[in-house]
Amino acid sequence: MILATAGHIDHGKTALVRALTGVDADRLPEEKRRGLTIDLGFAYATLPNGAEIGFVDVPGHERFLPNMLAGVLSIDRVLLVVAADDGPRPQTIEHLDILELIEVSEITGVITKTDRVAPERVEAVIGQVGELLAAAGYGESPVFPVSSRTGDGIAALARHLEKTAAIAAGKRAQAGAWGLFRMPIDRAFTLPGIGLVVTGTVAAGAVAVGDRLMVSPGGAAVRVRGLHGQNRPIETAAAGERCAVNIVGSFPAGGEPRRGDWLLAPERHLPARRLDLIVRASRHAEAPLRDGLPVHLHLGTDDVVGRAAVLDGRAIAAGEIGFVQIDLDRPVGALYGDRAVLRNHASRHTLGGGRVVDPLAPRRGRRLPARLALLEAMMPADPATALAQLLAAEEVVDLASFALVRNLGPAQLEALADQDAFLRIGSPRAPVAITRERLTALGDSLVAALGAWHQAQPDVFGPTRATVIGLLRAAAPEAALDAALGTLAASGRVVRQGSLWRLPEHQPRLVAADEKLWGRILPLLEAGELRPPRVREIAAALSLGPEQIERTLRRAERLGRVAKVADNRFYLPATLALLADIARELAEASPEAAFTAQMFKDRSGVGRNLTIHILEYLDRMGATRRIGDARIVLAGGELFA
């Protein structure tokens, strides 16, 4: 279990940590010289019941409040320290205000320096601290009087921490390792003979020696060489634990890891310049949180300047809640639920705090009612509830983006997707969730759009898949439209012939003259096999003009009987299916699962120029895709069946 201290300067936070652990958390020479905590300090203790507790000791001086924020934003349990001889002071109030704004789950009050005052004074300060905690929503929090110098009360506080640690361990065991690994870096340094070390409190997932990770938002790839926790080597570290990670990697000049960066699984690398937050304005704010205000955003262990845009109004009054978009001066690492604190541009006053709702925030339309409704739908911490609300609002949800923003692991996404409330469609790499009602409605819209297309072009068999999808591309993601089209085909509401689609009642026909001429052209195309005759060669064979042959072939093409592959050459669907199968066989036989134009030419026996025309046509139809000098296969001959 990890706890942080909080409280005013010189109220005995570091001495309390030393009394509980035997460790002086002040590590900097200046701290020891001045007797003043400047930066974060760390200490560990093993309690009598075997529970291991880590302490993050934060500075109390207002000048060092950014360092305090770096210590508490990823921690759920805090000791609020107040000196008996001084009572609550300004930084007591501001620290508690911050803890309230970021919704720290548990605060324990500790009254220090009780040996310096009369018992009546101790009781009075206990009452004052209890009132402050109650006003902040922590009315059930215990308050312990202690003296770090004499040891009075330390044992009682330690017993309380034992119970708290046991409860925390039970909750961690019940929750399991949630999500992929993420850790905000609060220290980065180099040790002789060891190399680069970064430290932090694990926010999600787990890390092990040998893992390949990324430093975000910079994007440098690293490998975990070693791990330390509780001052000893360890093999793994999980959410809620502090650890030091020895990493190996290559960094650009000036791009070495620093406080504010994240060490995380590469799949969770999401540099963001614009964030949508849910923010509560501080109860102690002297003025509302106004739209357009320049701010400091504290997130994870980072401190970055940005500008606030209040989305549901022009300002948020003290103690009130609203959505705020922050445009940042530089990228940060952020996902849903990350805690954030806003301070004024001079970094002297806390304006508000809350959590990230959407790290993929759009600038355009950010204040529209539909966008605000989406933000409301994103709010629930439970992924299943949030997904249900998003589907109710949008009816289609990109599951890959949802998993990224929510930091859901593969197993968690699978469990989420295995529900009757919606359908999972799309490819494994780009899954989409859609309600059955929305899929049915999209199908109806596609049928209507296809009917209108037939009316506009009655002599044409039907459009290609790309054209059909394009008819409603603005209405839904391609995966949803593709699934709706597949459902229509399975039910017989639409018919596919080759690469073209039509309604079953639509039966385009050639006029009698064209049908008669087609009967003479077809045997010539069949006889040509993989190299059908050119238009002028067909015209010469039939003693007709090339224009007449071209015109009839184009009308036949509209019916799906042929496809124009080159300027002067038409192919039958069956022949195209053979060519697509050749491409697939070549790719399957290749270790790289790809083939070149030369390989296709040698296998098919057609000339170089015609090979290029054929392959470019297969690319256009979605059967193949060119990557450099080679091609991969996306579909075989069934595309033209």
Mark where each language-model region is.
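Conserved G1/Walker A P-loop phosphate-binding module
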Residues: 1-58
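Conserved Switch II/interswitch segment of TRAFAC-class P-loop GTPases
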Residues: 52, 58-63, 72-124, 538
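Conserved nucleotide-binding/hydrolysis micro-motifs of P-loop NTPases
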Residues: 61-62, 85-89, 104, 113-118, ...
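Conserved catalytic-core segments of large NTP-driven translation/proteostasis enzymes
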Residues: 114, 131-285
